A protein has these predicted regions:
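Surface-exposed intrinsically disordered loops and tails
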Residues: 102-121
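Acidic/His metal-coordination segments adjacent to aromatic residues that form catalytic metal sites
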Residues: 118-135
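Conserved small/polar residues in nucleotide/adenosyl-binding loops
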Residues: 254-260
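Extended amphipathic alpha-helical segments with heptad-repeat/coiled-coil character used for oligomerization
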Residues: 167-253
Length: 262
């Protein structure tokens, strides 16, 4: 899964000590600091991260930490293919589909509008990636994508034959939003141009793929470090619908609060 790192010291102890010290220094943003990135993009980034990577110990891995990267298994595709939403498709027992229409099914919905992700009798999520129930914003984003899929099913005829077309359309939309909106907001313009014009990425038909001859893979440095910048984007409170100044405890809800509070 991960590329091999050339023989060299894995860690520089001095650098690690400096990083550890930085984590304990109190910081305060400037009084006039105003981010230009809307709050919801933090959680769209979390959704993307879940869609790209999910690591697990292989059967050969000992229980002790740290785990050698060669003994980790990647359970998701890094190709932005919405497996975290669709799972293995209509036959996936973890994802409740209406097999007659190819639509997602949920406990709380008005027509195609799904108000909460599907749950079992104990409130546990019934979705392809349970990590998308970590907070109410991410959970609602997952539910919104389910709703869009259901609307696309109607657009393509309203039967299970429409499922692959709706899935393809939503995946394409998702990839275009990542390229033309999300990453344009996060990356320097030169970096964005290099990534999409001068790299190993290309559009194969309509989908973003690694160029032929290149394997789609993610480095351990990206998964374990570079991608984690999103944690610093979390805000101390959020406004959600008519609720204002919800702290992080409220955003990291239990399912029992959702139907009456949001």
């Amino acid at each position: 899964m991960f590329r091999k790192i050339k023989d060299r010291p894995r860690f520089n102890t001095h650098v690690l000590d400096e990083i550890a010290e930085l984590q304990h220094r109190p910081t305060r943003p400037p009084e006039d600091f105003q981010t230009k990135l809307p709050a919801g993009y933090t959680y769209f980034g979390q959704f993307i991260a879940h869609d790209m990577t999910r690591l697990a110990r292989s059967a050969r891995s000992p229980s002790a930490n740290p785990v050698d990267t060669d003994l980790l298994e990647q359970l998701e595709s890094p190709e932005l293919d919405l497996r975290s939403l669709y799972g293995a498709g209509l036959d996936d027992p973890e994802v409740p589909y209406d097999l007659n229409t190819g639509k997602f099914w949920a406990n709380h919905q008005d027509g195609n509008r799904i108000r909460d992700i599907p749950r079992d009798n104990d409130g546990a999520p019934r979705i392809a990636d349970g990590r998308n129930d970590e907070n109410v914003i991410l959970s609602q984003l997952h539910a919104a994508l389910m709703s869009v899929h259901n609307q696309l099913i109607d657009w393509y005829g309203g039967t299970s034959d429409a499922y692959p077309h709706a899935r393809r359309e939503l995946t394409l939309l998702y990839q275009r939003v990542i390229e033309n909106d999300f990453l344009r907001r996060l990356l320097d313009a030169k970096v964005h141009r290099t990534l999409f014009r001068n790299s190993d990425l290309s559009y194969e038909g309509t989908f973003l793929k690694a160029r032929r001859g290149f394997a789609a893979r993610i480095t351990v440095e990206f998964v374990g470090a570079a991608m984690r910048f999103g944690h610093s984007m979390v805000r101390s409170s959020y406004d959600i619908n008519e609720r204002h100044d919800l702290d992080l405890d409220a955003v990291s809800y239990t399912h029992l609060t959702l139907p009456t509070s949001f």
